[in-house]
Regions:
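Conserved beta-strand-loop-beta-strand hairpin that lines the nucleotide-binding pocket
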Residues: 37-133
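Conserved short strand/loop->alpha-helix "switch" segment adjacent to the catalytic nucleotide/phosphoryl-transfer site
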Residues: 6-30, 34, 91-93
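STAS-typified acidic loop motif
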Residues: 1-3
Length: 133
């Protein structure tokens, strides 16, 4: 998994992301991939999944899209309620903070179940200052 995360970070910096932005997106990817690895195959099946990163630069900035595809059990991470981060630690339910961070660090999240696969995509626009001519 580390090599995939390293590749994501390297690609983002090469595409124009700052180091902090690339690290945030790496954290997003790590959270999503870790959830898939832990939860998608409860029977312990040794399965594989796809992680796809695309970037595009335009006048608005760097558009980043991260998509994961797996054939594990159906799970819509966008349907999970956000945790109550203001609640006392003793009163909080376990779990949910990872997806909370994913939501906070990305602009959009989209899930679909198609062809017995989970497809989860997050997108983020990394604005760039306009250069005067």
């Amino acid at each position: 998994m580390d090599s995939t995360l390293d590749a994501i970070e390297t690609h983002l910096v090469a595409a124009g992301a700052s180091e902090p932005e690339a690290l945030q997106m790496r954290l997003v990817a790590e959270e999503i991939v870790t959830n898939i690895a832990r939860c998608a195959w409860p029977d312990g099946v040794d399965a594989q999944f796809l992680v796809e990163l695309t970037t595009a630069m335009d006048a608005g900035g760097l558009h980043v899209s991260l998509t994961t595809i797996d054939d594990g059990v159906a799970f819509d991470p966008t349907a999970k309620a956000a945790p109550d981060i203001d609640a006392d630690l003793d009163d909080r339910a376990i779990g949910g903070l990872g997806m909370f961070l994913v939501r906070e660090m990305t602009d959009t999240q989209h899930y679909e179940r198609a062809n017995n696969e989970n497809r989860f995509r997050v997108e983020r626009l990394l604005p760039r200052p306009m250069l005067s001519t």
